[in-house]
């Protein structure tokens, strides 16, 4: 889901700023949006780690890893903002959450022999990248609301069809079944 949202946002953010006639200075923040998007993808990809750790007998590790995140993030943010400005803040966020989630990932892997990734994760990343590149190269020259809508429809369609065809997540089938029961079957 985070790849779906980020892909749609990143495909259309620049044109969205232009269509909404936002200040040109906001375009300088595009890479901040990209870096923060990557941080959210990492956090979402390892999102259940905190729930598993927090409800286990190792719940203290959840607290300590949060303290380590804070102790790592604050000085890193200060240093990077001081030297690189607003993009430094985004880089600090990405680095802090990457380290934080890696530590929790390793903890779960070692203590419980659990990890959230498999080959379908790789297929999801490849599918999203392919959908992004197709939309970017086919439709990037189309501006305005038309371009935004076309890119969003094509990107979303490629991902949704690919997710169902490749059976990348059982959640998608459950969501579809619930939708079908609620709206299509009477």
Segments and roles (model prediction):
Residues 137-186:
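Membrane-proximal transmembrane or re-entrant/amphipathic helices at the cytosolic face
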Residues 1-3:
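Selective transmembrane-helix segments that form parts of the transport pathway or gating/packing helices
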Residues 28-32, 116, 120-124, 128, ...:
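Residue-level signature of transmembrane alpha-helical entry/exit and packing/kink sites
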């Amino acid at each position: 889901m985070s790849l779906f949202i980020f892909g749609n946002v990143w495909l259309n953010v620049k044109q969205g700023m232009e269509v909404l006639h936002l200040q040109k200075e906001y375009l300088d923040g595009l890479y901040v949006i990209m870096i923060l998007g990557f941080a959210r993808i990492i956090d979402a990809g390892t999102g259940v780690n905190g729930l598993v750790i927090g409800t286990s007998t190792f719940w203290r590790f959840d607290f300590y890893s949060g303290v380590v995140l804070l102790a790592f993030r604050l000085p890193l943010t200060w240093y990077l903002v001081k030297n690189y400005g607003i993009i430094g803040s985004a880089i600090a966020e990405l680095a802090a959450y990457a380290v934080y989630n890696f530590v929790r990932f390793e903890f779960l892997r070692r203590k419980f022999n659990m990890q959230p990734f498999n080959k379908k994760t790789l297929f999801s990343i490849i599918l999203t990248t392919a959908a992004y590149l197709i939309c970017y190269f086919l439709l990037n020259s189309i501006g305005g609301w038309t371009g935004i809508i076309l890119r969003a429809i094509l990107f979303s369609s490629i991902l949704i069809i690919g997710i169902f065809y490749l059976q990348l997540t059982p959640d998608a089938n459950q969501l579809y079944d619930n939708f079908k029961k609620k709206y299509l079957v009477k």
